[in-house]
């Protein structure tokens, strides 16, 4: 059996070019297998050599057009994707955008996803008990008067708005009629509230026209009585041996403060919220994760390095930028590359006005003018001195 110090020195000696994280992972694995199988020094050296060989094989060749390859590798499987919005895997009650629309949403860095949702994991105390998980879900779920109402009526003669509350919904939300009235009274000073059993009568003080009454009724119906803003319904599901909450809508910053929530595992599909709350590195990881899971949902396989390159380009400046004319492509230094993408005439006019010069360093601009592209063998500029041929002396005639 080889000592740990020998393993460490062999890794440092033979795998000098390996990244630090690969070295540490290799050390941990060798340590484990050395204890289990009593490896010899020659076997350990052979393993390290194989790892170095595989690492060098995985490296990008100098001059490889990584951007073009990444675009093709993500673009080609995307043509086989569905264009529909499907139900979230295993949660039929919550709609979530999948397939190509979701990929477009991510790379366009849309501020508001079409179907925002959060996956809320719970702490040790709440994750194994359904009742406790539902208690946390009630704290998160946004409840409005409209959610509790069985029916709503406008009494145009007495200028009143009458709401029939559903007792079951009221109990499920953890509210009482007294709490509902108290919340409404603190928010709407310009109205009187009267309770008769499960009937709530609202009389606005300053509504002179029917249109005022209608407007006021809409405002009261949409008023949030409890829960987080931006979050609609919540679903509690059992996954493995623990309960997980899925939400329709997202409020990532506030959900992490809710007692009972595990902030280390809770996630949202809104990339901008992640960037704001957890920072740009977390947003980069979220972009990679969202694209990979969307592809896998459709049964498509893409090398993660292509997706990592896209995520790196989108988060390079410390903010989440879209790929497109308002982001990565729009900020290219080459006029011809920008013009080739979108709004051609405008780009050319603006460049002419400023007197911009295109140095033809990229792929697109060189393709446009018919020059060899500066990738692969096109990167090499050959310079050689030709031997000067000695001039023959003029023969005298």
UniProtKB/Swiss-Prot annotation:
One of the GO BP terms on file? DNA-templated transcription
The GO molecular function terms of this record are:
DNA binding; DNA-directed RNA polymerase activity
On whether Kinase is a keyword of this UniProt record, the answer is no
Which Pfam families is this protein grouped with?
Answer: RNA_pol_Rpb1_5
What reaction(s) does this enzyme catalyze? RNA(n) + a ribonucleoside 5'-triphosphate = RNA(n+1) + diphosphate
Q: Which UniProt keywords apply?
A: Cytoplasm, DNA-binding, DNA-directed RNA polymerase, Nucleotidyltransferase, Transcription, Transferase
- Role this protein plays: DNA-dependent RNA polymerase (RNAP) catalyzes the transcription of DNA into RNA using the four ribonucleoside triphosphates as substrates. Forms part of the jaw domain.
- Protein family: Belongs to the RNA polymerase beta' chain family.
Q: Which HAMAP family match?
A: RNApol_arch_Rpo1C
What's the name of the protein? DNA-directed RNA polymerase subunit Rpo1C
């Amino acid at each position: 059996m080889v000592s740990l110090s020998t393993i460490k020195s062999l890794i440092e000696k033979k795998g000098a070019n390996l990244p630090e994280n690969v070295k540490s992972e290799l050390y941990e694995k060798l340590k484990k297998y050395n204890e289990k199988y009593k490896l010899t020094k020659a076997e350990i050296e052979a393993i390290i050599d194989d790892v170095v060989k595989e690492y060098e094989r995985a490296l990008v060749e100098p001059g490889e057009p990584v951007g073009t390859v990444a675009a093709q590798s993500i673009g080609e499987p995307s043509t086989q994707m569905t264009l529909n919005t499907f139900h979230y895997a295993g949660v039929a009650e919550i709609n979530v955008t999948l397939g190509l629309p979701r990929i477009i949403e991510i790379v366009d860095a849309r501020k508001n996803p079409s179907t925002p949702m959060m996956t809320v994991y719970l702490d040790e105390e709440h994750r194994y008990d359904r009742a406790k998980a539902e208690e946390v879900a009630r704290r998160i779920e946004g409840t409005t008067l409209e959610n509790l109402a069985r029916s709503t009526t406008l009494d145009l003669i007495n200028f009143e708005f009458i709401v029939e509350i559903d007792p079951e919904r009221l109990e499920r939300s953890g509210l009482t009629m007294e709490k509902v009235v108290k919340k409404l009274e603190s928010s709407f000073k310009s109205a009187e509230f009267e309770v008769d059993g499960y009937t709530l009568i609202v009389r606005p003080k300053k509504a002179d026209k029917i249109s005022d009454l209608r407007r006021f009724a809409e405002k009261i119906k949409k008023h949030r009585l409890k829960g987080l803003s931006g979050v609609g319904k919540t679903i509690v599901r059992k996954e493995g041996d623990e309960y997980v909450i899925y939400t329709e809508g997202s409020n990532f910053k506030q959900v992490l403060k809710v007692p009972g929530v595990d902030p280390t595992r809770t996630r949202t599909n809104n990339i901008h919220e992640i960037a704001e709350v957890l920072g740009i590195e977390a947003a980069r990881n979220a972009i990679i994760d969202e694209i990979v899971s969307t592809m896998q949902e459709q049964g498509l396989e893409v090398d993660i390095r292509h997706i990592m390159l896209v995520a790196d380009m989108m988060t390079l400046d410390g903010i989440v930028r879209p790929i497109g004319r308002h982001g990565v492509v729009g900020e290219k230094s080459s006029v011809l590359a920008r013009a080739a993408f979108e709004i051609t005439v405008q780009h050319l006019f603006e460049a002419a006005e400023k007197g911009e010069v295109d140095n033809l360093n990229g792929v697109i601009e060189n393709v446009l003018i018919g020059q060899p592209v500066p990738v692969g063998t096109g990167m090499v500029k050959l310079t050689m001195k030709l031997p000067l041929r000695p001039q023959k002396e003029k023969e005298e005639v």
